[in-house]
């Protein structure tokens, strides 16, 4: 929102929320009716093509979002090296409003503008006219309108909303108040209306012009330099006809320079070009050819079939919220399966997120496999090869710590990471599975005054550490599985071994639960029971009768941890899993020991370090 919102700032269909697309329904239905009732030669192809055009533009914009986020996560050729936060993502979530407005205007034009009906596929003279009118009137009028928007009166009421984003994403380009964007649409309609009135309009020329506007807008706000220098060497005048991402980035950091739409020519002739434009462009290309150095690499992986949309390079709005299964995502199953096949064939991890905390640089890399792949025996070797390759690459890049998240640390897969340490004994990076912090989070999540708990579910490395810690605190631990009880009993010190027992009829109101716990066993718990997971994945919440569930082991992150604008799987905003935080603490504290295999660090030391650096327990559900 602008600092002092003016008239017609809010979009008129804001209250419709996700139902705003119904605004286009009358024209879409009319188009289908035309197709159904008229012959092929009588149907207005241009009118019918508007809906596919809008869908193509949405796909085009989403492609830019994904590419930009992947590139900026790597840090390569990045222009502004600052992070963005959730407030910017929330502010820019309605980027499709501009496409809806454009669609309404296109439908109205196709119905009522003379010469806008029954357009041919292509006319060269019309395409030339569009190019001339854009380079002339559109660019000229936009330049002076843009300068006017930077006057205090208009800036505070309208344009400041756009400039709230100093670090831009591609969709920042269309984040404007309603009145301002209407003015832009009227500007861009000049070439289209002129072609219609002169009888030179064509479907392909119109679509190419709209794609050109979207492409240049997205490119100018993508925050990484992608225009090669050889283009300007080969054709020097291009410098005045096409801006670069670094050129427009200066407008968002300096505010009073580089006003041009897409053609810097007008900034040159009116002396408003930023003097550092060429230097920033060259530095963005020259100094960022290598990926950004990293101190901590966290290895994660895809979970469900639709989880790819919730990762940071996916849908920005989905990534900014905890993962939940949405019914309408099922309609995207063809794309989901295609994404799975593509990631399955991809032979390397890929960077999905970059964060900074106290000069410690962190990246999250995703292993291109889904959770169900980890349960397939014939996939384990390939997955191990992918993880091993990622560990070696991180070590080569100078990473101090590699933390293993989700199933990448499964004991049956790689002995909690010990397999890589045995194969590469001179590995410089510390391998961390995060058991100590995960166990500490579970122990400190138990309400004070609790004297007994029930431990149910598969006995993992974290479960062992939790059971040992609780027994040492003289808290009674009751296990519901006899086989697991006999497996864990020898690992408890003899002096406190009596605190671990087996019973099928435990009455404790605190349950520590892991993977493998079925619904029937949950129903054995009393009303008012608190379920605290110690597993990587959240349990199925089947008890709605006054029972409560904690999150999987996790902590809220401090404000010093920057560039956090996506949720880690199902966790709330600015909350990270204990396994991921453990790697960060390892680097912050400069610990030189590995935590993998059977090794577990001192839980009290790790917990104290987490609190000292500003990580906080998550409020219980």
UniProtKB/Swiss-Prot annotation:
Disulphide bridges, residue numbers: none
Recorded topology in the membrane: Multi-pass membrane protein
Domain (Fatty acid hydroxylase) ranges: 138-272
Reaction(s) this enzyme catalyzes, per UniProt: a long-chain fatty aldehyde + 2 NADPH + O2 + H(+) = a long-chain alkane + formate + 2 NADP(+) + H2O
Keyword Lyase: yes
UniProt-listed InterPro entries: CER1-like_C (IPR021940), Fatty_acid_hydroxylase (IPR006694), Sterol_Desaturase_Related (IPR050307)
Keyword Endoplasmic reticulum attached: yes
Keywords assigned by UniProt, alphabetized: Endoplasmic reticulum, Lyase, Membrane, NADP, Transmembrane, Transmembrane helix
GO CC annotations on file: endoplasmic reticulum membrane; exine
Location of the protein in the cell: Endoplasmic reticulum membrane
Membrane-spanning residues: 99-119, 126-146, 186-206, 224-244, 332-352
EC number: 4.1.99.5
Main location: endoplasmic reticulum
Top-level EC class as recorded in UniProt: lyase
GO molecular function: aldehyde oxygenase (deformylating) activity; iron ion binding; oxidoreductase activity
GO biological process, one term: pollen exine formation
Subunit structure: Homodimer.
Family, as annotated: Belongs to the sterol desaturase family.
Function: Aldehyde decarbonylase involved in the conversion of aldehydes to alkanes. Core component of a very-long-chain alkane synthesis complex.
Protein name: Very-long-chain aldehyde decarbonylase GL1-5
Source organism of this protein record: Oryza sativa subsp. indica (Rice)
């Amino acid at each position: 929102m602008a600092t002092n919102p003016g008239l017609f700032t809010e979009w008129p269909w804001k209250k419709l929320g996700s139902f705003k697309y119904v605004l286009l329904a009358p024209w879409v239905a009319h188009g289908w009716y035309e197709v159904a009732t008229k012959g092929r030669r009588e149907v207005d192809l241009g009118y019918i093509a508007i809906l596919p055009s809008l869908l193509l533009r949405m796909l085009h914009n989403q492609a830019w979002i994904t590419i930009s986020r992947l590139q900026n996560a790597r840090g390569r050729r990045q222009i502004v090296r600052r992070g963005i936060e959730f407030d910017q993502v929330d502010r820019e979530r309605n980027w499709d409003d501009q496409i809806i407005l454009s669609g309404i205007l296109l439908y109205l034009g196709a119905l009522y503008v003379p010469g806008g009906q029954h357009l041919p596929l292509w006319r060269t003279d019309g395409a030339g006219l569009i190019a001339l009118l854009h380079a002339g009137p559109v660019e000229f009028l936009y330049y002076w309108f843009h300068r006017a928007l930077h006057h205090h009166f208009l800036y505070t009421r309208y344009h400041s909303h756009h400039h709230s984003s100093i670090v831009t994403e591609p969709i920042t380009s269309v984040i404007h108040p309603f009145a301002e964007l209407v003015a832009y649409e009227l500007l861009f309609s000049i070439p289209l209306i002129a072609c219609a009135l002169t009888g030179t309009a064509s479907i392909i020329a119109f679509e190419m012009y709209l794609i050109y506007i979207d492409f240049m807008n997205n490119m100018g706000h993508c925050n990484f330099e992608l225009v090669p220098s050889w283009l300007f060497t080969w054709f020097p005048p291009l410098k005045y006809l096409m801006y670069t991402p670094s050129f427009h980035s200066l407008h968002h950091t300096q505010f009073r320079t580089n006003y041009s739409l897409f053609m810097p020519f007008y900034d040159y002739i009116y002396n408003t070009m930023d003097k550092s434009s060429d230097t920033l462009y060259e530095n963005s290309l020259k100094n960022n050819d290598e990926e950004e150095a990293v101190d901590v690499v966290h290895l994660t992986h895809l979970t469900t079939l639709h989880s790819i949309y919730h990762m940071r390079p996916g849908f920005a709005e989905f990534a900014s919220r905890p993962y939940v299964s949405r019914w309408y995502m099922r309609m995207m199953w063809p794309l989901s399966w295609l994404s799975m096949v593509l990631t399955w064939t991809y032979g390397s991890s890929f960077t999905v997120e970059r964060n900074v905390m106290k000069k410690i640089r962190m990246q999250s890399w995703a292993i291109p496999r889904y959770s169900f792949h980890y349960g397939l025996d014939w996939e384990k070797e390939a997955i191990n090869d992918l993880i091993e390759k990622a560990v070696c690459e991180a070590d080569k890049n100078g990473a101090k710590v590699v933390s293993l998240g989700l199933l990448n640390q499964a004991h049956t897969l790689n002995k909690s990471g010990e397999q890589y340490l045995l194969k590469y004994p001179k590995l410089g990076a510390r391998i961390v599975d995060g058991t100590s912090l995960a166990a500490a989070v579970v122990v400190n999540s138990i309400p004070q005054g609790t004297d007994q708990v029930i431990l149910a579910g598969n006995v993992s490395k974290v479960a062992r550490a939790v059971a040992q810690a609780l027994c040492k605190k003289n808290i009674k631990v009751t296990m519901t599985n006899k086989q697991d009880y006999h497996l864990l009993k020898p690992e408890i010190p003899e002096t406190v071994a009596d605190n671990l027992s087996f019973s099928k009829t435990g009455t404790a109101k605190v349950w520590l639960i892991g993977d493998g716990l079925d619904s029937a066993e949950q129903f054995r718990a009393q009303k008012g029971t608190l379920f605290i997971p110690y597993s990587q994945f959240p349990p199925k919440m089947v008890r709605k009768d006054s029972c409560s569930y904690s999150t999987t082991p996790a902590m809220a992150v401090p404000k010093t941890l920057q560039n956090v604008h996506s949720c880690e799987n199902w966790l709330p905003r600015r909350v990270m899993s204990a396994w991921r935080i453990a790697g960060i603490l390892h680097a912050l504290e400069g610990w030189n020991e590995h935590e993998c295999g059977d090794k577990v660090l001192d839980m009290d030391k790790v917990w104290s370090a987490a609190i000292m650096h500003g990580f906080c327990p998550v409020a219980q559900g």
